[in-house]
Amino acid sequence: MEQFLKGLPKVELHAHLNGSLGIKSLCDLGERLYGTSCKDFLKLCAHFSRFEKDMDACFEKFAFVHELTSTREGLRFATELAIRDFAEDNVQYVEMRTTPKANENYSRRDYLQIVIDAIKAASETYPEITVKLLPSINRAEPVDVAEETVSLAVELARAHPNLILGIDLSGNPGKGRFSDFAPILAQARDKGLKLAIHCAEIENPSEVKEMLHFGMSRCGHGTFLTPEDIGQLKQRNIAIECCLTSNVKSGTVPSLEEHHLKRIMEADAPKVICTDDSGVFDTTLTKEFLIAAETFGLTREQCIDLTLEAVHHSFASEQEQIQMADRVGNYADILVK
């Protein structure tokens, strides 16, 4: 099964840039920035690979990667390395999310432009993978920062219409209020951007109700969705982005066997398997499919169907979706023969 899943041309719809650098890529990035003998960097790498079942500890790990990407060179190289990691896992399409940041080395506009340029450069090196960009709103940051992010996303989407396709709302779910960001998200939607919203990542029924009423293009995590919530999403054909390893390692799900993917499959609601932060959680999309297959008894045919479901729920153009589905279909045909 693992070899089959490795060869499957997969589709990744929930991947955060700064969390998607594997240990090898982190070491490559650290070597590029600091050389091979930096003891502080090696110590940080060792800490990064340890894990506690605690969501706050997960978010603390991002501070390490943010430091590595705090320069133009670091950000550019990190973007290319993340794409390399997905390409090596035979991911044919990825929608990468990242929160624009500002420091003494770049503005938020610069940040997005650096990432855009890196994506375009990587397309020459890794032509087999298509990369799209979803600028992220961090709900832990002030509303005016979110306003700037959406403004930049709308502007840059005009310049790069086939690259920036939507907006992501993410960040520590225990911080900020959705109601503060809803008007900004509505503006993005009115300008033609899709909305990928982290929803029900922690238990907060009133916020979930508010989010479902507001609407979204895809639902991130959906850990604490009720059967009624899942039914609403099914009725609206809104896919739930399921990140198994992430949810277990961050402590929001007790075990793989208790993961809500099972309930979603039983309800026959739209769902996609994703990594979330493949570097932080030491996983790959191949591993996530394998975990789902071993935990819930998925067949090869079901894994192919899940991949086609991801194609359908991607923000890609109709022509791109047809091309992706053809690659999956051709792979399935080869196996049958």
Swiss-Prot record:
Q: Which family does it belong to?
A: Belongs to the metallo-dependent hydrolases superfamily. Adenosine and AMP deaminases family.
Enzyme Commission numbers on file: 3.5.4.-
Q: Which domain of life is it from?
A: Eukaryota
**Which protein are we looking at?**
Adenosine deaminase-like protein
An example of a Gene Ontology BP annotation on this entry?
Answer: nucleotide metabolic process
Give the annotated active site: E201 (proton donor)
CC cofactor: Zn(2+)
Q: Which residues are noted in the entry as Zn(2+)-binding?
A: H14, H16, H198, D276
Listed binding positions for N(6)-methyl-AMP are H16, N18, H66, T98, T99, P100, K101, G171, E201, D276, D277
On subunit structure and binding partners, the annotation says: Monomer.
Instruction: Please give the catalytic activity noted in the UniProt record.
Output: N(6)-methyl-AMP + H2O + H(+) = IMP + methylamine
Q: A Gene Ontology molecular-function term?
A: adenosine deaminase activity
Keyword Transferase among record annotations: no
Q: How is the cofactor bound?
A: Binds 1 zinc ion per subunit.
